[in-house]
Amino acid sequence: MHFLDQAKIYLKSGAGGPGAVSFRREKYIEYGGPDGGNGGKGGDIVFEAVQGLNTLIDFRYAQHFKAKRGAHGQGKDRTGAGAPDLVIKVPVGTQVLSEDKEEVLADFTEVGQRVTFLAGGMGGRGNASYKSSTNRAPRQHQPGQAGEEMWVWLRLKLLADVGLLGLPNAGKSTFINAVSNAKAKVGHYAFTTLVPKLGVVNHKGREFVLADIPGLIEGAAEGAGIGDRFLGHIERCRVLIHLVDISGEDPAEAFQTVNAELEAYGEGLEDKPQLVALNKLDLADEELVAGFAEELLEAGADEVFAVSGATGAGIEPLLDAVLGYLPDSTSTETKGSEVEEVDEEGGEWSPI
């Protein structure tokens, strides 16, 4: 599936239906009074967060969303039918932003969350509502109220418990493949990962979502490389795993480069707890590992784990440390526990 995390779309709610001009026509009644009904309400524009979507790719091909207008009013005081709401389904983690991207208008963080974004126009008045003691046969009516319209941006921020970051070629794809069900592309060159990847990790009876984002390079905040566009996908993470390539020229400098980009990006990423992992342990001896770990501690790391995504060495202590930052139940675990609670409360089936 192609990944797209930003899309610009046009929205327009439905206009209200016009009121009717009508008069009663009955046998033996020469002058029937007005009986034109009101118009129906226009359709609303509604956003709904649904499960099973993790990209905005559908909005590349469908960019204009217009709700239907309400039906005309009719004779015999019949109000026109209201138009159905136009429901736009988006992935959980989607934000709706103003056209200039300066204001967040809606933020969808839970499955089933619905927001009525643009209200449909109210139906116009029929001539029956204009009848008065001085105007027994009014012919005026109201057109329906116009719908609302605007351009908005959709921005997807994936919901993950743990974020995985580092310079290009730090071994992030190999690592996420080793610890989760992800099937990320692996290659011996920089920028193998071009879009974020999600994987579900099961460790010691716990389950959490790990997000791998494309590698950062110096100047990413100014647009170098792939840039910092994908950093938004780890804004909601509780803890970050910072992979540092032990076979690189200067692991301490690599560590500082990534942290400088986090600080330049802002949004609180520089303050998130980090678990620093020297990756590719299988390519170095113990003395070299110890020396690089000491340099990372001096560079600001709180604790350093030596791991190998290729062989699995050292990964278990790292995942143990991750569990210490997670809540009692993560988003994936909550769904399972809710089902179990319902089963326990229900007990044996009874028709009563």
From Swiss-Prot:
Residues 160-327 form the OBG-type G domain. This is GTPase Obg. One of its GO terms (biological process) is ribosome biogenesis. It comes from Erythrobacter litoralis (strain HTCC2594). It comes from the Bacteria. Mg(2+) binds at S173, T193. Its cofactor is Mg(2+). Residues 329-352 are annotated as: Disordered. Belongs to the TRAFAC class OBG-HflX-like GTPase superfamily. OBG GTPase family. GTP binds at residues 166-173, 191-195, 212-215, 279-282, 308-310. An essential GTPase which binds GTP, GDP and possibly (p)ppGpp with moderate affinity, with high nucleotide exchange rates and a fairly low GTP hydrolysis rate. Plays a role in control of the cell cycle, stress response, ribosome biogenesis and in those bacteria that undergo differentiation, in morphogenesis control. The keyword Magnesium applies. Its EC number is 3.6.5.-. Residues 339-352 have a biased composition (Acidic residues). The gene is obg. It is an enzyme of class 3 (hydrolase). It is found in: Cytoplasm.
